[in-house]
Swiss-Prot record:
The organism of origin for this protein: Conger conger
Record-annotated Globin domain positions: 2-143
Name of this protein: Hemoglobin cathodic subunit alpha
Record family assignment: Belongs to the globin family.
Stored InterPro entries: Globin, Globin-like_sf, Globin/Proto, Hemoglobin_a-typ, Hemoglobin_oxygen_transport, Hemoglobin_pi
Length: 143
């Protein structure tokens, strides 16, 4: 599934609204993922506290949302732009790529809850396609 020019514009515009609160959105989405999909906790076993709002979750949000913001900037070449990050996830972190979809879903829910006016159906579809493309790019080095 490829992103159209309109999709890219919608994603960039929406990210412009979100980026000022990206840390809060990341913490909420990561906390949500750890509660709704408890199997993902295995990747964060080194954290002393995995509960939503804990310091480790707050720290993890910066990594995740920084990567999302970076991906928005590389929206025209996600595969090439996220190649190094894909390599880290595949070889060093050994994260099951199915988990990218789980986090993407939690991000979508978080955006919908926090931006009910801005996160229209059209924006939702564009951001969903974008996150699916990011997930595919991150999974590329698993092959």
């Amino acid at each position: 599934m490829s992103l159209t020019a309109k999709d890219k514009t919608l994603v960039k515009t929406f990210w412009g609204k979100v980026k000022g609160k990206a840390d809060a959105m990341g913490a909420e989405a990561l906390g949500r993922m750890l509660v709704v999909y408890p199997q993902t906790k295995t990747y964060f076993a080194h954290w002393s506290d995995q509960s939503p709002g804990s310091e480790p979750v707050k720290h993890g949000k910066k990594t995740i949302m920084g990567a999302v913001g970076d991906a928005v900037g590389k929206i025209d070449n996600l595969l090439g732009g996220l190649s190094a990050l894909s390599e880290v996830h595949a070889t060093k972190l050994a994260i099951d790529p199915g988990n990218f979809k789980l986090l993407s879903h939690c991000l979508l829910v978080t955006f919908a809850v926090n931006y009910p006016t801005d996160f229209t159906a059209e924006v939702h579809v564009a951001v969903d396609k974008f996150l699916a493309a990011v997930s595919a790019a991150l999974a590329d080095k698993y092959r």
